Design a protein with these regions (language model features):
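Structured beta-strand/loop patches that form or line metal/cofactor-binding pockets in enzymes
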Residues: 20-53, 141-161, 352-374
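Short beta-strand elements
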Residues: 46-59, 161-191, 303-305, 374-381
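Amphipathic alpha-helical
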Residues: 250-269
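Acidic low-complexity segments
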Residues: 4-13, 20-32, 77-163, 196-238
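N-terminal alpha-helical targeting/anchoring segments
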Residues: 32-88
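A generic local secondary-structure boundary/capping motif
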Residues: 13-15, 42-46, 127-134, 156-164, ...
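Short, acidic (Asp/Glu-rich) active-site segment that either coordinates a divalent metal cofactor
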Residues: 62-63, 171-202, 267-273, 309-331
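Dual-mode signal for accessory low-complexity, basic/Gly-rich regions
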Residues: 264-433
Length: 433
């Protein structure tokens, strides 16, 4: 950490000497221990180290940024010169700013020393379990890694943050095959600090694998479903909420005043059961953000509480441009409050609808309209899953969807990056051939 501190300190001094009125730097070293598997075989085992140095300088109300992957003196000197040059070519804007001096903090998160033997055993156990218990499932790719990061942040207001974090992660891509029938690829994954629980039992790995086996027998949906209920799995709901985040309350939509909710702060904007936070400090989030590049420690921030819009996830720059208050966290680290019913009961109470595992489509229009393919989906009739669907389409409006919530499950996906329930909605068109 001392090495990173000295690099950050030296770089910041060079940046100010070169003419920056204010700015910040962050020096980081990342360490990755990675296992890859293809089918039953492990194909890669490696450890890599990477350096990163980010610079941001402001001169005459203009901004310049650059990033390099070297700590060599010559590389740093060039990066400083480039940063000042980029600022000189930038557009003048008095809204550029960093936060005043904050209390210096040292952050430590997760496992700073990996148990690689136990981690490898858990990964091997997962591969063996899939091959034994789900013979139809073919592992296309498995990437398991332990990632450690050490960083030092400094700015010209003399705020200094240091951070060390370490976590395990797994990404799994797979399909199912029976005879000549092969499903499309599906995926699952998580970030964790827990090596005591088998990986098949973490996040929704088991549910996702079982779901792909059910996809071996698919049928096309004919026509439209009238007055359908669409139940989004947690992973799919995270997709839809990310679209909502960007279109309705995100940085660019607020800055450009294209947000449909621009004048709705403090107003009810969706179903009262929706409470949506960005929560890097939640204990279920693994190694969440600790501070912003503008020089302030982050805190959990509620954007929507009981359906009421409480804040926009914007930067200090956008806050200065618009007059809205910048929250303590403007990243997408979603934690959505769970409901009271089980997903089993929600399905039982659904007369006509579909369960959607993932969504494939373009980015929604500026007004929130969306249209795309409902992938890994199932038809629901009279309270039960009937069969897997192929080529089903869903279309609607994100705002209307969240204003027509049928129910929210008590079960949640906790994969280290989010906490998300199943959410059932109306006002969505479901169509087949």
């Amino acid at each position: 950490m001392e090495k990173l501190y000295n690099i950050a300190d030296t770089t910041l001094k060079k940046l100010t000497k070169a003419g920056a009125d204010f700015g910040y730097v962050m020096a980081s070293i990342t360490e990755k221990h990675e296992f890859n598997a293809d089918g039953e075989k492990f194909t890669l085992l490696r450890t890599t180290y990477n350096n990163s140095l980010g610079l941001c300088g402001y001169k005459d109300h203009k901004k310049g940024t650059t990033n390099i992957n070297s700590f060599d003196k010559e590389a740093i000197d060039k990066a400083v010169a480039d940063c000042i040059s980029f600022a000189a070519e930038g557009k003048e804007d008095e809204a550029y700013a960093i936060y005043p001096k904050q209390d210096n903090e040292d952050f430590k998160q997760g496992e700073l020393v990996p148990d690689t033997d136990k981690f490898f055993k858990r990964v091997t156990e997962l591969v063996d379990t899939i091959n034994k218990d789900y013979p139809q499932v073919l592992i296309y790719e498995l990437i398991a890694s332990y990632d450690k990061s050490s960083s030092v942040y400094m700015n010209t207001n003399e705020t200094v943050y240091t951070k060390e974090s370490g976590k395990y992660s797994l990404v799994l891509e797979f399909c199912a095959k029976e005879g000549e029938t092969v499903t499309s690829l599906s995926g699952t994954g998580f970030e964790t600090l827990d090596l005591d629980t088998p990986f098949i039992e973490q996040a929704m790995v088991k549910q996702d694998i079982e779901s792909i086996v059910e996809q071996l027998n698919v049928k096309a949906l004919n026509g439209k479903l009238e007055d359908a209920t669409v139940i989004f799995t947690p992973a799919c709901m995270a997709q839809m909420l990310m679209f909502y985040f960007g279109t309705y309350i995100g940085e660019s939509s607020v800055l450009e005043k294209t947000s449909p909710l621009y004048d709705k702060l403090g107003c009810e904007v969706c179903d009262k059961r929706i409470t949506f936070k960005s929560a890097p400090k939640d204990k279920r989030i693994v190694c969440g953000a600790s501070f912003s590049s503008e020089g302030r420690a982050v805190k959990d921030t509620t954007y929507i509480e009981n359906g009421v819009l409480k804040a926009f996830p914007i930067s200090l720059y956008t806050a200065n441009k618009t007059g809205f208050e910048a929250p303590y966290c403007n990243s997408y680290i979603p934690v959505v409050e769970a409901g009271e019913k089980s997903i089993e009961d929600i399905i039982k109470e659904t007369k006509n609808g579909i369960l959607v595992g993932s969504y494939s489509g373009g980015h929604p229009a500026g007004n929130g309209d969306f249209s795309g393919v409902a992938k890994n989906s199932f038809l629901i009739e009279d309270g039960r899953k009937v069969y897997a669907l192929s080529e089903a389409m869903i279309s609607g409006n994100l705002g209307d969807m969240l204003n027509n919530v049928v129910d929210i499950s008590k079960e949640t996906l906790e994969d280290g990056s989010m906490v998300m329930p199943y959410i059932a909605c109306k006002k969505i068109v479901v169509a087949g051939k």
